[in-house]
From Swiss-Prot:
Full protein name: ATP synthase protein 8
Predominant location: mitochondrion
Cellular-component GO terms for this entry: mitochondrial inner membrane; proton-transporting ATP synthase complex
InterPro entries: ATP_synth_su8_fun (IPR009230)
UniProt-annotated location(s): Mitochondrion inner membrane
Family statement drawn from the similarity comment of this UniProt entry: Belongs to the ATPase protein 8 family.
Subunit structure: F-type ATP synthases have 2 components, the catalytic core F(1) and the membrane-embedded component F(0), linked together by a central stalk and a peripheral stalk. The central stalk, also called rotor shaft, is often seen as part of F(1). The peripheral stalk is seen as part of F(0). F(0) contains the membrane channel next to the rotor. F-type ATP synthases form dimers but each monomer functions independently in ATP generation.
Residues annotated with N-formylmethionine modification: 1
A Gene Ontology biological process term: proton motive force-driven ATP synthesis
Mitochondrial intermembrane side: 1-12
General function of this protein: Mitochondrial membrane ATP synthase (F(1)F(0) ATP synthase or Complex V) produces ATP from ADP in the presence of a proton gradient across the membrane which is generated by electron transport complexes of the respiratory chain. F-type ATP synthases consist of two structural domains, F(1) - containing the extramembraneous catalytic core, and F(0) - containing the membrane proton channel, linked together by a central stalk and a peripheral stalk.
Bilayer topology: Single-pass membrane protein
Length: 48
């Protein structure tokens, strides 16, 4: 189990934080604006 070998701790922390940052960027730049646009369109359609 490489998770228990201290040599791999820094590598796992680095790539773990890198993955979290990439997920945060993906959510904030792609997914949330799409959901906001979808919500606005639904609101405008119901107001017709």
């Amino acid at each position: 189990m490489p998770q228990l070998i201290p040599f791999f701790f820094l590598n796992q922390l680095f790539y773990g934080y890198l993955a979290l940052f990439a997920l945060l960027v993906l959510v904030s730049w792609v997914i949330l604006p799409y959901l906001l646009q979808l919500q606005i369109v639904r609101l405008l359609i119901t107001k017709l």
